[in-house]
Each structure stands twice: as structure tokens, then as C-alpha cells.
């Protein structure tokens, strides 16, 4: 549920002008999520959302810049520990199996960290396909994933 909710928060912040936690909580409730202000506050912190100037004397929530932060890596580690059940590789492809409904959240976290060895990710419901830049990069990627699970 948390992964879906946080994915929805990212969508809302990209698509709408969200100025306050209350507005975000209301938008989440309209989308079918039962949330408290404390939950919204924690999600904002975990996702690294920032407030940026909007119009005159106003601010809105926005996605953070595409820089790798310690928080992004910690979020990915938590998601791996909580949601990833296995992974394997073939040539320059890595397939990750997750709990049902978790693949898109994990793939988004991988994309946010922006590993230079990874060309891209494709996520379904419980499976992620990672395309490495070349097969020589795969051991390095898998070593990082191994660290996340220990």
C-alpha cells in the first residue's frame, strides 16, 4: 500500500499544483487512499519532495532534482529489503521479482538513483526488467543489489 501511495504522490505532484500537505492528503483521499497528515508528512520526507516558488508569494511541492542523494539510496535499500524476492540475469538483462504490486515502486527508486550502468527499467506488477548498458556492467549492478539485501 505504501509503495502505491507514494507512487500516486509522485504522479499528483507532477500533474497538479499541490501547495500544502492538506491539499496532498485531500488529493490522495479522492484517489482512494485513506491517509493522515502524519502519513503524508512521512511520505513527503521519504520521497524527498521540495517546495519551490509558485506564482507570487506562494510555494508548491515538486520532485527533487535528479541528483543521487543518500535518501534515494536508503529508500531503494528499504524497498529492496521489503519487496524484492529474487533477481537473475542473462547477457545485459536483469530480471527482478517483487511482491505483487511492488515492481513499479522499486523500478522508480532504481531510476531515481540513476545508476550510470543502467540504461533503463521496465516494470510490470511483480517483475522488473533492467537493461544494462552492456553485459560487462551486470556484475557491478548485481553486486550493488546484493549489498541492498544484506
UniProtKB/Swiss-Prot annotation:
**InterPro entries, alphabetically?**
Arg_repress (IPR001669), Arg_repress_C (IPR020899), Arg_repress_C_sf (IPR036251), Arg_repress_DNA-bd (IPR020900), WH-like_DNA-bd_sf (IPR036388), WH_DNA-bd_sf (IPR036390)
> Main site of residence?
cytoplasm
Q: Name one GO molecular function term.
A: arginine binding
Give GO BP annotations, semicolon-separated.
Answer: L-arginine biosynthetic process; protein complex oligomerization; regulation of arginine biosynthetic process
Q: Which SUPFAM superfamilies match?
A: C-terminal domain of arginine repressor (SSF55252), Winged helix' DNA-binding domain (SSF46785)
Keywords in alphabetical order: Amino-acid biosynthesis, Arginine biosynthesis, Cytoplasm, DNA-binding, Repressor, Transcription, Transcription regulation
Q: Which Pfam families match?
A: Arg_repressor (PF01316), Arg_repressor_C (PF02863)
Tell me where in or outside the cell this protein is found.
Cytoplasm
Q: What metabolic or biological pathway is this protein involved in?
A: Amino-acid biosynthesis; L-arginine biosynthesis [regulation]
> Which Gene Ontology cellular-component terms appear in the entry?
cytoplasm
What NCBIfam families does the record tag this protein with? argR_whole
Role, per record: Regulates arginine biosynthesis genes.
| Sequence similarity | Belongs to the ArgR family.
Which protein are we looking at? Arginine repressor
List the gene name: argR
Amino acid at each position: 500500500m505504501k509503495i502505491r501511495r507514494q507512487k500516486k504522490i509522485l504522479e499528483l505532484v507532477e500533474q497538479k499544483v499541490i501547495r500544502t500537505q492538506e491539499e496532498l492528503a485531500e488529493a490522495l483521499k479522492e484517489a482512494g487512499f485513506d491517509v493522515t497528515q502524519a502519513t503524508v508528512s512521512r511520505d513527503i520526507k521519504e520521497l524527498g519532495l521540495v517546495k519551490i516558488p509558485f506564482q507570487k508569494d506562494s510555494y508548491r511541492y515538486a520532485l527533487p532534482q535528479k541528483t543521487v542523494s543518500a535518501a534515494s539510496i536508503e529508500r531503494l535499500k528499504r524497498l529492496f529489503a521489503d519487496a524484492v524476492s529474487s533477481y537473475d540475469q542473462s547477457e545485459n538483462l536483469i530480471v527482478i521479482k517483487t511482491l505483487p504490486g511492488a515492481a513499479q515502486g522499486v523500478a522508480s527508486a532504481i531510476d531515481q538513483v540513476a545508476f550510470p550502468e543502467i540504461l533503463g527499467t521496465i516494470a510490470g506488477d511483480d517483475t522488473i526488467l533492467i537493461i544494462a548498458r552492456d553485459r560487462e556492467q551486470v556484475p557491478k549492478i548485481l553486486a550493488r543489489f546484493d549489498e541492498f539485501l544484506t
